[in-house]
């Protein structure tokens, strides 16, 4: 069994790096990110770090495996909507990540917020769960899900 613990602000860099690696080949993220000229290796983890610092660490629950190779962001009911000030704080890392594709990213964020607003009942939301590719298929993601789903049920 893999040990899971709540991430602290001191873990933010590790969580951002892990999620950055986990999503490096994600089709949606690749569509949002600027064409990869080696830029994503720098901008991906930085964007995750900014999201964690500005939006998720203050109001969500972030868990990681004890070895730091997998992480999940778990947003409580009715906590998914970020203030407009967060968008302004996130624009610099979003621009570094997306470049000229910034419009795609902002449209996706807006569409997701509209979808949440139409939800029939309060719900927990997982915007990100990921495992460093070098450690995938070892049950780390399952351990994270089991940990948080036990509380949600």
Predicted segments, located by residue:
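A short beta-loop-alpha structural element at the N-terminal edge
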Residues: 3-17, 21, 28
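A short, aromatic/hydrophobic, helix- or strand-capping loop or linear motif
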Residues: 27-35
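Anion (oxyanion) recognition and catalysis
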Residues: 153
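Active-site rim helix/loop that mediates acceptor-substrate recognition in acyltransferases
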Residues: 37-61
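Conserved beta-hairpin
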Residues: 53-74, 130-132
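Conserved acetyl-CoA-binding loop-helix of GNAT-fold acetyltransferases
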Residues: 131, 137-150
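Conserved acyl-donor/pantetheine-binding loop and adjacent beta-alpha core of acyl/acetyltransferases
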Residues: 73-130, 136
């Amino acid at each position: 069994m893999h040990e899971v613990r709540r991430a602290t602000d001191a873990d933010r860099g590790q969580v951002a790096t892990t999620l950055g690696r986990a999503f490096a080949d994600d089709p949606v993220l690749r569509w949002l990110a600027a064409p990869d000229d080696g830029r994503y290796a720098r901008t991906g983890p930085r964007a995750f770090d900014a999201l964690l610092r500005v939006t998720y660490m203050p109001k969500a629950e972030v868990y990681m495996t004890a070895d730091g190779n997998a992480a999940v962001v778990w947003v409580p009911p009715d906590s998914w909507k970020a203030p407009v000030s967060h968008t302004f704080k996130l624009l610099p890392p979003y621009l570094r990540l997306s470049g000229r594709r910034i419009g795609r990213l902002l449209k996706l964020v807006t569409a997701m917020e509209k979808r949440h607003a139409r939800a029939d009942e309060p719900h927990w939301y997982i915007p990100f769960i990921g495992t460093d590719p070098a450690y995938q298929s070892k049950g780390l993601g399952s351990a994270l899900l089991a940990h948080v789903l036990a509380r949600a049920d």
